[in-house]
Amino acid sequence: MVTDVAVTRAANIVTVLGGPTALIHLAGWTLLTDPTFDAAGTEYQNGPVMVRKTADPALKPSQLPALDAVVVSHTGHQDNLDTAGRTVASGASKVFTTVAGAKDLGGAAVGLEPWQTRTLSKPGRTPLNITAVPARHGPVGTEAITGPVTGFLLHTDDGSAPTVYVSGDTVDLDAMSALADRYRVDVALLHLGAAGFEEFGDIRLSLTAVQAVEARRLLGDPLVVAVHAEGWAHYTEDRSHVQQLFDAAGVPLHWPTPGQPITLPDPHTR
């Protein structure tokens, strides 16, 4: 009889927990992205803007499996690392983030420069590479306001597991094109929602649906899983709008139900 843990270890699965937060079981490793575990209704003053969480996470921190690593796209915004999420990250044995984020978190956090790779390795497991992908949290010129951010590519040298791109909060399509020039991308967790605030006018700080359709093309048509699109009040494009634009473009989109696992395709397949 195969145990649930063994099944999880053998499968390549993504489980979105809400907002940008996802559990990724890949090549026998378990990773968590951008931990957000505070309760719905929590508000945060972030510089000139207020951010408000509108949905509870699908799992509480106490319900998480053992984590091999946590990847944090940036530490300065609570919709990517809230109070409870920061506690989860601080307690992890391995954390990968931006250089500035590592200084912020301290402890086990490792800051990665663009295109820098670190590898998870243990006896009996396929090594898993974590490569930092350049990102920009808004249009050119907003960097001083938004701060540094990074995406991540999770990949194996032997190609035995699907290659998974976690975009982080970015609208940098040129970086995605550069990523596709370097690596095959089988699955893309794209941070959607077209995040915006009245104080910033028409500036959007994460991908619009139109940008996401183009991002998929540039990345080589991977399976797209929508994250960072529900659960916070500052997302300006809702599910129906995003789905409508993807359907109009004839582009498939996997919109997850929080807490429900998604089995990833085999490498080289769509």
Task: Please report, for each region that a protein language model flagged, where it lies by residue.
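Pre-active-site segment of Zn-dependent metallo-hydrolases
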Residues: 2-4, 29-72, 83-86, 139-143, ...
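Metallo-beta-lactamase
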Residues: 2-9, 94-161, 245-267
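Conserved beta-strand hairpin/beta-sheet module of binuclear metal-dependent hydrolase folds
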Residues: 7-60, 144-168
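Divalent metal-coordination and catalytic microenvironments
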Residues: 24, 34, 74, 82, ...
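Structural motif
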Residues: 29-31, 68-69, 94, 128, ...
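Active-site environment of divalent metal-dependent phosphoester hydrolases
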Residues: 38-40, 75-81, 102-105, 116-119, ...
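Cap/insert and terminal regions of metallo-dependent hydrolase folds
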Residues: 53, 100, 171-260
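Mobile, glycine- and charge-enriched loop segments
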Residues: 65-68, 131-205, 256-269
